């Protein structure tokens, strides 16, 4: 399971600035759910190849409503589901009553918490953080998030050791074992007999969507048809239920983000729909089924979830639920809206179903298998290079500074999603339009459906770049003779 880091603190202490630093973007809004999880932003970050989900929570000001109430509205869920908390304070403003109230709550949760003092630029860090030791949270890490000072030290001394300690607790994933073995073979390491292939693994399928779009109904419909006993897989956390099932001789693991609960125990929408569980299910899945309500259309929440799915590179099947009972005119309007708002998703199958009555549900698994097979299929270097050559013959790369961009060869760079690595000269200068052309050409040639495809470009380093051209003695003598000839001719 992908670990979660939550940033908490009073308003304007620099949580969003640090969030953008960790996610390495100025606009790291991956999923924003207004009204449900107010003012919280979710992003994917990485430390030395280790991925984690970062949450920028809303500011907690400790007003008359009470810190507990305020946290329950916007930050309590994030703290409860986080693996570690970075508690941020403002070194310039000093210790505030709200800081003490937040620290008291964090101590009661017994959650790994690290105190980060921001805005220490221009101050003596040792003097600026003295008052915050009274919070009883141990060592204080001074940073200046706006300038990046101290952030690297925070990563190296806090987050990285914590993630290394967390790693041994995770179970070995057969998927990871398989792809590690495959990469070793690709790198020319000694190849052992391969009894392990993607078809031998169960397909991990996550059903995600907004509240009340019919995820639970669809899950129950699928399980009801298969008559599978539901149980918690050992090692799973945060109430995500992993449900083994079989259909048409193929094994699946259905990831139920809502959890198996009686309807009477679900007290509010926040409990029913956990953003964190949804994002982690997407990261852990092979194929994601995005459920959309046909009666409400495509909302910003749907697009936010879709953005996270695309960013994670997972295979995708789009399911439009509650299709029954709609007039033909309304159905045509829904399809037009889908084409308009989801026109850029040209690789995913779209199914129109009724989870309540079961119509169209049986056809979903054909698309799931197709998407999984497309994302895990092995393709050799010779085949990829041949496709690249055909693409170049059909449409030449553009000229860059008077020279034609040259593409040399292509090979596989990874799977799930498929990655094609193209080597050549001046490839960094290729326009986005030509990159999209190549991506679509590879998709069509390889018949990739249901899975995104990514193309990476690499070019060899010029050994003479940034080096002064030094003439040899022979070249110097030739140059002198040439200069004498030019002077005589004048």
From Swiss-Prot:
GTP 1 binds at residues 9-16, 56-60, 118-121. Residues 377-461 form the KH-like domain. GO terms for biological process: ribosome biogenesis. Keywords: GTP-binding, Nucleotide-binding, Repeat, Ribosome biogenesis. Residues 3-166, 203-376 form the EngA-type G domain. The keyword Nucleotide-binding applies. It comes from Escherichia coli (strain SMS-3-5 / SECEC). GTP 2 binds at residues 209-216, 256-260, 321-324. The lineage of its organism: Bacteria, Pseudomonadati, Pseudomonadota, Gammaproteobacteria, Enterobacterales. This is GTPase Der. The keyword Protease does not apply. Associates with the 50S ribosomal subunit. One of its GO terms (molecular function) is ribosome binding. InterPro entries: G_ENGA (IPR031166), GTP-bd (IPR006073), GTPase_Der (IPR016484), KH_dom-like (IPR032859), KH_dom-like_a/b (IPR015946), P-loop_NTPase (IPR027417), Small_GTP-bd (IPR005225). GTPase that plays an essential role in the late steps of ribosome biogenesis.
